[in-house]
Amino acid sequence: MKAFMDKDFLLETPTAQHLYHDYSAKLPIVDYHCHIPPQEIYEDRRFENIAQVWLGGHQVLADGSDYYFGDHYKWRVMRSNGVPEEYITGDKPDRERFQKFAESLEMAIGNPMYTWCHLELKKYFGYEGVLNGETAEEVWNLCNDKLQHDPKLTVRGLIEQSNVAMVGTTDDPIDSLEWHKKIKEDPTIKVVVAPSFRPDKVLNIRKEGFADYIHKLEEVVGRKFACANCVVSALEERLEFFVEMGCRASDHGLDYIPFTETNAEKATAAFKKAMAGETLTKEEGDEYTTYLLLKLGALYKKHNVVMQMHYSCLRNVNDKMYRKLGPDTGFDMIAVTDCSATISSLLSALTKEDACPKVILYSLNPADFDMLGTILGAFQDDEIPGKIQLGSAWWFCDTDDGMYQQMKTLARLGLLGNFIGMLTDSRSFLSYTRHELFRRLMCNLIGNWVENGQYPNDEKALKKIVEGISYYNAKRYFNL
């Protein structure tokens, strides 16, 4: 029997162990998509206890509204174990909340959360044991002592000891990027903290709050919008500002990726109707969103900004809890959508105008991996190897099986050697161990192919592939 999560954890062959320890493990991390707040990087926040880091909590904003923040992966684990909500997002003491989580984690056999937590405890706190209800007090005291006193466990310390080269935050076009500016001007901060341009609220024309958001965008750029091209012009202005602040990527969170025949007149008609408070049909909404995606794609190409598109998620499906806690609190699910024709049509339209940027396609539904894998090959060109990417196994797919499936699909239908690798998509500064888990699985997969005689034991070629997927492909892709 193997020891619990030892140095060769998940590395089943000597080749896998060699590839991981000698090539992959030592390389920097390019965390090109996450949700961590840049303010906490600049202020070098120190957390008081492990519950604050892992479970987050609740605060009342200046306008009196409630805001719930934290790791909703962990919140779902606790809810699945029957833990009352007051211990999850409520105001119960942190020690009691941590106890409930530890008791829940014990039941999470096979869940990636179990692996993530123990990798974090081992890497950042030197804890070699097992977290459960009985050891919760021991772990609580150990972690809190280190969090409060260890200079390596401030936010910047965590980033530095994790060997992070780049952090790609997620930012709204109306954001002032004040913290990115301060970070950029601070010579003591070595990591690249790059804002990512996420204009979801501009594209979601049929969702509640669209008109209110457009008014906020008008205030930021200092003019009113009479047409769809006015919106595009404002977005270009904001994108140029983001690029000045170091932006390397955009991000689009879409229920589905639309495409329909459209033009400026159709998009403007839909825009005016929405601003008047009228209800749009799906076709009208798609005409507007398609038009903006085409215009934005061309702008991303012009400014060398990567276009990320995430889709196939049904969000906030528990209406009662959504109204109580708001979005991003653990009440989303995988959707079944057929976007094969629309994605290919969108990329084709952009390519026809020589306006297709670098694109990363993520589906929350693993059933889409093969379809996306075949789309990639239809739109690659000589701008850069792997210009169109199959996004890393995302969210509910971020499991051992999900990562293996994504990598095997890419290997089977494209070039795994040009894959830009892992991202955390996280709100936690301890989550960089997810890159370790990915690298172990990647080296194990490649190691097994070599040991089985499916790829030669060519040291030079294997080194290039493993180091590329771990770091160098992303470094090139995001112009670091």
Locations of regions flagged by a protein language model:
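Divalent-cation-assisted or electrostatically stabilized phosphate/pyrophosphate-binding catalytic cores
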Residues: 336-343
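Hard-cation-handling environments
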Residues: 313, 318
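Short, basic/hydrophobic alpha-helical segments
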Residues: 346-352
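Metal-cofactor-binding active-site regions of metalloenzymes
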Residues: 1-303, 355-357, 361-373, 377-480
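Active-site loop ensemble at the mouth of alpha/beta enzyme cores that anchors a bound cofactor
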Residues: 322-334
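Short secondary-structure transition/capping segments
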Residues: 43-44, 320-322
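C-terminal amphipathic alpha-helical interaction region
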Residues: 307-309
